[in-house]
Amino acid sequence: MDVFSFVKIAKLSSHRTKSSGWPPPSGTWGLSQVPPYGWEMTANRDGRDYFINHMTQAIPFDDPRLESCQIIPPAPRKVEMRRDPVLGFGFVAGSEKPVVVRSVTPGGPSEGKLIPGDQIVMINDEPVSAAPRERVIDLVRSCKESILLTVIQPYPSPKSAFISAAKKARLKSNPVKVRFSEEVIINGQVSETVKDNSLLFMPNVLKVYLENGQTKSFRFDCSTSIKDVILTLQEKLSIKGIEHFSLMLEQRTEGAGTKLLLLHEQETLTQVTQRPSSHKMRCLFRISFVPKDPIDLLRRDPVAFEYLYVQSCNDVVQERFGPELKYDIALRLAALQMYIATVTTKQTQKISLKYIEKEWGLETFLPSAVLQSMKEKNIKKALSHLVKANQNLVPPGKKLSALQAKVHYLKFLSDLRLYGGRVFKATLVQAEKRSEVTLLVGPRYGISHVINTKTNLVALLADFSHVNRIEMFSEEESLVRVELHVLDVKPITLLMESSDAMNLACLTAGYYRLLVDSRRSIFNMANKKNTATQETGPENKGKHNLLGPDWNCIPQMTTFIGEGEQEAQITYIDSKQKTVEITDSTMCPKEHRHLYIDNAYSSDGLNQQLSQPGEAPCEADYRSLAQRSLLTLSGPETLKKAQESPRGAKVSFIFGDFALDDGISPPTLGYETLLDEGPEMLEKQRNLYIGSANDMKGLDLTPEAEGIQFVENSVYANIGDVKSFQAAEGIEEPLLHDICYAENTDDAEDEDEVSCEEDLVVGEMNQPAILNLSGSSDDIIDLTSLPPPEGDDNEDDFLLRSLNMAIAAPPPGFRDSSDEEDSQSQAASFPEDKEKGSSLQNDEIPVSLIDAVPTSAEGKCEKGLDNAVVSTLGALEALSVSEEQQTSDNSGVAILRAYSPESSSDSGNETNSSEMTESSELATAQKQSENLSRMFLATHEGYHPLAEEQTEFPASKTPAGGLPPKSSHALAARPATDLPPKVVPSKQLLHSDHMEMEPETMETKSVTDYFSKLHMGSVAYSCTSKRKSKLADGEGKAPPNGNTTGKKQQGTKTAEMEEEASGKFGTVSSRDSQHLSTFNLERTAFRKDSQRWYVATEGGMAEKSGLEAATGKTFPRASGLGAREAEGKEEGAPDGETSDGSGLGQGDRFLTDVTCASSAKDLDNPEDADSSTCDHPSKLPEADESVARLCDYHLAKRMSSLQSEGHFSLQSSQGSSVDAGCGTGSSGSACATPVESPLCPSLGKHLIPDASGKGVNYIPSEERAPGLPNHGATFKELHPQTEGMCPRMTVPALHTAINTEPLFGTLRDGCHRLPKIKETTV
């Protein structure tokens, strides 16, 4: 037995010779009556002897000289034979080195002298141990008369316990002629020992069941181990990858099904067969440690691959995967297995389900649960389809081979989340606290902790490479204490049932050898045997007499300094001192204490006794002693650097390296400190977790469970390819917060993204800020004894922004360039905009930056409306996190946006990715409560909700290019002359859980919080202008017929009702508008089913004879404050309206409306808006024509740039051509030519003309009835929607949400397309 295959042994270093070695060379070990090599014997204070095994770090009382059946080296024999004239020398030699006697000829000269298996070491006094076979043959042939051979029997091999070479030769010469039945019937009864579910075939003969249905029987004695059986089966079955296999016990219990128990290779068959209820068990030879990739196993070992396929088929049929194996997967696997069986047997070229059912039966391929719960007709129908679909697994023209089908079978099966893994229930012990936990152990999960069984959230607790060793100790009743020593921190202590504990330890050790180090065993039965089946180790207090053998006693004192920054001196004391003095008090004192040991040894028993809960520094202190075999132990002030683990370099650390206060005692920095932290600390610590979640899948622990969400490495930051849960709120067991030693996965060898030689740097944190577990010069730094992570706000903001951006990122294929470019442009303009915006007055207004629209830079830039303080709307706490400014550029085009969750399906035209993303994200807004009505101001920065308190427009003249702050209520209640922006109501409160946000919004609040607190009301659009207009140039024109006069809301509800009922324009100052105290859902027009909105359109609309001819009535148009003429509008209309095909009925006009910043005079004289009206605005100043042309130019330029760059999804389902005269996509498309064009027919619909676009008149139904007697029926007839009407504007790009109710709709009957984003040009 290779003693080096169990644990990593600490080395004794020599700085003089620069060499290290442990243990000493075997040449210094004498075969006397002292303990065997690597053992020492000592006595406790009671005088009882016990032994220390340095190979396995065990301390048993049993004498290893009696336990170990020491093998007596075989003695060489000299054999002299004379040549027979017929038979020669009478033996057959092999070709090995040395040459082995294969067989002895009966009746020949060598019979009775040579034994099959003898190794020929000398021929006639010539050594031939290393000689080639030809030389041996020549020497034998050269002996004519006689020959003198020196032979030796080889050392007994593990398989010799079953059959020797000599016995094999005898069996060949005299084979057994009689075969006995396995079931021996005595007096009509079958013996209990030979039943099918029995371990023993007969006394001392173990029967092992293979997955292919065969059985193998092995005779054993008291020293035969499980490993002997495995090696023999490896030879018999020609298996190369034996590391995947193990023996298991299948225990059948009535009513509870079967249970598989892993057997450790060091267990003896005697121990196994003497277990209670062994007569109800079977021994199985199985692949217990499945490979990650079945193709890799196929390349390395085809025999093991075939065995894995057969075993997997049996597991599926026998329902060993439980409820996780769904019916659809079971049917697909059965279809593949049927195909493989038919192709392999080559009975027929055609895959016939009838033939398969007749030949094998469906029960051979399907679990009984499927056969019992599904109708046979449906099963056959599904299988017939799936058998034919198997051909789709290969390219067309090629036939699926049986080997390919097996690979696909195993790949389908490997998707099961319990494939090769197991779930364990255990009790986690932390000092005095005990908590029930659920662990998941598997090749893809390592040792994972099921944090929340309701949401099935799982986090990686420790990777297999992080586990140094596993120890088991018997507890009360049937419980066993399992200690998982992970890295160099405090071990994980679990209380489990004995069978589960054994399975956990064996499974972890098996995967460690498979995936990490095949030469090392991290779990040894010696540890379990010392505690569970034998007496416990000695007391490690008091004085002990150490009987040190010569192999490890150092004759002189040697002192050298430890590595690195350590100051601890390692002293080897003269071996004449034969005592070990350990104080009776706790081994982790605050003052300086010493442990004097004159012989180097590592003792787990000492470690177990010296370790106290919550005293991690002391434990790590002693672990350094145990691993390095140090002979001097100082207090915490001279802690040693722990011996690095075999994979210690591949450790990524979680918390920063924060200095520990000298006044803090080590026990206060344990698990309890982290458990007592509040949510704030947990929120800080979550930023330091990394959530890669490459391949984690769900796990069905119970039939009701939907599936466990695996978030690799991350406990609180649930970012991955699975459903994300509420971060810290969704965690029911905050236990991983205390034992999250392993931040990286054990896929460090395969797919670890962390460097193996460096500490992991989280975010932008510097490398010195990461905890380095390899050592410290002052205090031992333990992951469980660190203060909460700290950091400046910038780091927290950066980490949180990265976290939220990762969550809120659009799905793959649904991202447009506006996401990146907007954030870049905003970041670039942030410093100067912040400085410019300091003079503005409304810094305290919370603003939700939904979409920042960059515009082309041309002309003079105006200062932004406000510092865009990103905050959640309607939040209980207004947390302002970041200020973003962007210059308001009025070069000619300002794109205004309104999100409408109500839209019809695509009308057949092209729909770009941004439109679909926004539509799908906003569609869920219909389900949310509507409890806020808020106005939004659309500027170049985004949409700014205007506070209800600030409802006043400044009456003074604004600075050059400046735009006065606007408010929601003022915009809603002010007359047309006081309204610089267009007011467009939003019928729904946008409250979406899946809304895409800009990066600024994500800086402080999490996406979940944002979604839960987002409430959006009516949306106001404002478009600023770079030019100031004169009042005379913008004088409004109104048709003579005034019986359909539009109404404007007044300062109060009463005034508003009276003025609108009288059909006259009322005028109020901008200050009076703040008295509108009831701007609620009931008073807004869009909240009533029968209410309609009417848009004050351009002055050019007043002269549209087509519209007037329809009913003979038009609405008076409010006076414009900006210089906007009908000619300019008519010239700009073709370019501005050609993109709004979808969403407009034929003849429906959404005219572009450009608002110019008004001067003080405009605001002070609102009466001028009503002073003059005329039938047609026939006379237009030349200056206005130039302005209109300039607007037309900028509109066309901006439209082309937006369409080419893909900003804000301009390439939507509407016609995207700027010059197109009409969109013809579907019934939702409409003529986009100007109204005066003969192509646009007249309909009985009226829009309020507005030369300047300074406001929108919305008229409740009860107030509109007397003023608009002829239009109520018309609107109801043409637009039979229960929801409120919305204004009509020119919409170059319309975005729609699928399957939602209309919000910004048209008046056309049967319109299937409603605009989502409306844009206004300047």
Curated annotation (Swiss-Prot):
Residues 78-155 form the PDZ domain. InterPro entries: Band_41_domain, FAK1-like_FERM_C, FERM/acyl-CoA-bd_prot_sf, FERM_2, FERM_central, FERM_domain, FRMPD1/3/4_FERM_C, PDZ. Signal peptide: none annotated. GO terms for cellular component: cytoskeleton; dendritic spine; protein-containing complex. Residues 809-847, 900-927, 952-983, 1027-1080, 1105-1148, 1160-1180, 1207-1227 are annotated as: Disordered. Residues 902-921, 1041-1054 have a biased composition (Low complexity). It is found in: Cell projection, Dendritic spine. Pfam families: FERM_C_FAK1 (PF21477), FERM_M (PF00373), PDZ (PF00595). GO terms for molecular function: phosphatidylinositol-4,5-bisphosphate binding. It comes from the Eukaryota. Residues 204-519 form the FERM domain. Coiled coil: none annotated. Keywords: Cell projection, Disease variant, Intellectual disability, Lipid-binding, Synapse. Its main location: other. SUPFAM superfamilies: PDZ domain-like (SSF50156), PH domain-like (SSF50729), Second domain of FERM (SSF47031), Ubiquitin-like (SSF54236). SMART domains: B41 (SM00295), PDZ (SM00228). Interacts (via C-terminus) with DLG1, DLG2, DLG3 and DLG4/PSD95. Interacts (via N-terminus) with ARHGEF7; the interaction is mediated by the PDZ domain. Interacts with GPSM2 (via TPR repeat region). The FERM domain mediates the interaction with phosphatidylinositol 4,5-bisphosphate. It is linked to Intellectual developmental disorder, X-linked 104: A form of intellectual disability, a disorder characterized by significantly below average general intellectual functioning associated with impairments in adaptive behavior and manifested during the developmental period. Intellectual deficiency is the only primary symptom of non-syndromic X-linked forms, while syndromic forms present with associated physical, neurological and/or psychiatric manifestations. This is FERM and PDZ domain-containing protein 4. It comes from Homo sapiens. The gene is FRMPD4.
